[in-house]
């Protein structure tokens, strides 16, 4: 089997992976269990590779997976308006150009101490 079940149905698992992938793209570092970190590494690597391609088809493929969440919001005093950047825009404009010279290996998993409640192995996954 090429993936972990993570104790969920396929729809729940896909939703969780989409959420965690989007959170990692927005925050660039998240704390999760070790098994989840190893699973979202695959999806994040694919999304960054799509971002590096940068064409319309790659953008649409990434948009089909990444959640439509606001990554940052800035206030422009000149126009008296807020401008927001979505996770997809951040992927294509900030994250992908950063890895233009790197072929894969965009994430790093750091193991941390076990979770207090159930002693699940925890890890920090971050963009390199």
Swiss-Prot record:
GO biological process, one term: translation
Cysteines paired by S-S bonds: none
InterPro entries on file: Ribosomal_bL17, Ribosomal_bL17_CS, Ribosomal_bL17_sf
Keywords from the UniProt entry: Ribonucleoprotein, Ribosomal protein
GO cellular component terms, A-Z: cytosolic large ribosomal subunit
One example GO MF annotation: structural constituent of ribosome
Top-rank taxon: Bacteria
Short name of any one Pfam family annotated for the protein: Ribosomal_L17
PROSITE patterns with a match to the protein in the record: RIBOSOMAL_L17
Family affiliation: Belongs to the bacterial ribosomal protein bL17 family.
Protein name as annotated: Large ribosomal subunit protein bL17
